[in-house]
Amino acid sequence: MARDMTPVLKRCRSLDLDPIYLGIDKKSNRNARSGRKLSEYGMQLKEKQKAKFIYGVLEKPFRNYYAKAQKLKYGTTGENLMILLELRLDNVMFRLGYGRTRKEARQIVDHKHVLVNGKPVNIPSYQLKAGDVIEIKEKFKGAQRYKDILEVTGSRMVPAWLEADHENLKGTVTQVPTRAEIDVPVNEVLIVELYSKSLSKPKRRVLECLNLTDRELKLRKFLKIRNMDVL
């Protein structure tokens, strides 16, 4: 899997992002750059990069989240995008205080320390829903690692849409969060504008074709050879 190897604080500076949103309580000693004025596209791109960086999501899965957000029948695309990102298992672990950073929470999930509704889940992007119960496996509950984590995160405020039981290393998604309850400094409207422009009609048609069966693709190729309209 591809990773962004840019130092975290350097990346935060380039995105004008306070590291506290990543769970990092320190700032770079370097002076902030007096950045040049961004174009409309530059601002849109920056917001997308910021959201991807905060949640640790690469371009392809991020685009998939956007496509899923578009298909939801309720809410706006931008708000739905943020809610889908917020309900990732690794993010919820971070919000509950079972990871000092989302990166650490992701590692804990990867290492099969987590149960969701009593069943082991090791997929950081696993999508949670209202009523789901998250718990650290019993055999890991006494580990020094979690004592050290809670020493740092125990004083953090847990979002209203979550219920944390730090004593038993459990947590519950009591409801789906609203956009107002998601404290990330991202302007999702600009992200929607960016994707709306990039997914022009020809590109949308290409994406639709990618979902066709082999038989349909062969038929389209056959018609195209004979200069027939295939769209």
State where each predicted segment sits.
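Ferredoxin-like alpha/beta domains used as RNA- or RNAP-binding modules
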Residues: 1-96, 123-227
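Beta-rich strand-turn-strand
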Residues: 99-102
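Short, well-ordered loop/turn sites that connect or cap secondary structure elements
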Residues: 108-109, 128
